Amino acid sequence: MYKSTIMSKRITKFTFVGTLACTFMVSSIGLVNADGHGVYGPFPITEKSYNGSKKNSVSYGGQIARQLQHNALKKLASKGNPNDPTNAPEKRMLSYFNIKDKSKTLAILDPSPSSSKFPVKQKMIGDLSGGANLSGKADKRIQTSWPGNMSGVDVIKFMIKKAGKTKGGVDTRNGMNYPQLISKYTMGAVLYHQACDNYLDEKMTASSKPNNKPYKKGAYYTGKEHSWDEAFGYWGAAAHTMKLTAAQSYDIAKKKDLKAADYNNDG
């Protein structure tokens, strides 16, 4: 149920809400020309200096790719094997944490493209964005709640190493559930951090990313347009969230309601 165009049309219907709650949905985002009943655009190009061929000012495929990289980390964290001398589980998790999938080598793991009940059209992370990773956007500041003066990046890598050597990712002796720990911490240190401490913080000031200039040289969207869109992408909600009931949103998050998820009926 994902299609690729400007960045990607169908993507993470996973819903990231705040630092503690995250329900992942597979929904369309407003990036493309489509029969989306007015939800998906195209949204006009308002950046006056742009002379290219783009017709839709919305673009946040990188954020959606990161949502799916987060999902993959959570899934892989349950595959730890203390008897693997090659550290393969850790290495695979690190690939989803570090790699920008320009060469399209990272498969989408959750939701599964091969699912018969809740399929998605894209197969690879790189189908959504070839320039996105998690490690580059994780909080670089010292995490005072952790020993050793670790940054947010260090903490996630530390937990990945532990998960890779823990059977099933759950250390019952020490009370550590690494799929949950890695997921929740990544949501806070990457997704929430970027949305609330970057795009909706510094980039909302008058002197940063002004609305009468391109976000960056050659961009087809203004500074404030793109800052809002990037924050929305990190939140991760479906473009048509406001047309869903609470029950539908919940069922989509549980991958139960494909009809509600596929708002523009393109399969």
Tell where the protein language model's regions lie, with residue ranges.
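Bacterial N-terminal signal peptides
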Residues: 17-27
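Short linear Ser/Thr-Pro motifs
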Residues: 8, 27-28
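Mature extracytoplasmic or organellar-lumen-exposed domains after removal of signal/transit peptides
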Residues: 34-267
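Sec/Tat signal peptide C-region and signal peptidase I cleavage site
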Residues: 28-34
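Bacterial N-terminal signal peptides that target proteins for export
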Residues: 5-18
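Short non-domain terminal segments
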Residues: 12-14, 22, 41
